[in-house]
Amino acid sequence: MPIKTIKIMVEGGNVKPGPPLAPTLSQLGLNVGEVVKKLNEATSSFKGMSVPVTIEVDSSTKKYEIKVGIPTTTALLLKEAGASEPSGDPAHKKIGNLSLEQVIKIAIMKKPGLTTKSLKAALKSMLGTAKSIGLTVDNRDPKELVKEVEEGKYDDLLAKYENEWNGVKE
């Protein structure tokens, strides 16, 4: 029972039954409409974002499994900030503001795809991305917050989310 793996990026909740997906699914003998419907259901919580998806197909039984990945950090930060795209000039043109708690929640969401072992390190990574796309956090430059996170200023806040962080499977 050879397993065929298809890795694609789709728009959350808006997968269309066209190329390049449809021909690949048809070649494997799958019902394109059914797979697209299941993909849209599986990715609906990431509406409007680019989402990595893996479809594993058993070519002998035609059974398949859809595994939804997590959108990029940039996509999650932009969605949370209500912005459509990163700033072309992040040093001078800010596109939105997030609270530190919003950034912590995104760090927790991204845990399975991160190499960092602690919530503190993950938060610093998210803050770096926020800075690079032109977001402020708590109406401040994220670089300032990284320094304060390193100094332990937010350890109490991070402790509040530690159980949630530890509960996420890697």
UniProtKB/Swiss-Prot annotation:
The gene is rpl11. SUPFAM superfamilies: Ribosomal L11/L12e N-terminal domain, Ribosomal protein L11, C-terminal domain. Belongs to the universal ribosomal protein uL11 family. GO terms for cellular component: large ribosomal subunit. One of its GO terms (molecular function) is structural constituent of ribosome. GO terms for biological process: translation. PROSITE patterns: RIBOSOMAL_L11 (PS00359). InterPro entries: Ribosomal_uL11, Ribosomal_uL11_C, Ribosomal_uL11_C_sf, Ribosomal_uL11_CS, Ribosomal_uL11_N, Ribosomal_uL11_N_sf. NCBIfam families: PRK01143.1 (NF002232). It comes from the Archaea. Part of the ribosomal stalk of the 50S ribosomal subunit. Interacts with L10 and the large rRNA to form the base of the stalk. L10 forms an elongated spine to which L12 dimers bind in a sequential fashion forming a multimeric L10(L12)X complex. Forms part of the ribosomal stalk which helps the ribosome interact with GTP-bound translation factors. The keyword Ribonucleoprotein applies. Keywords: Ribonucleoprotein, Ribosomal protein, RNA-binding, rRNA-binding. It comes from Saccharolobus solfataricus (strain ATCC 35092 / DSM 1617 / JCM 11322 / P2). This is Large ribosomal subunit protein uL11.
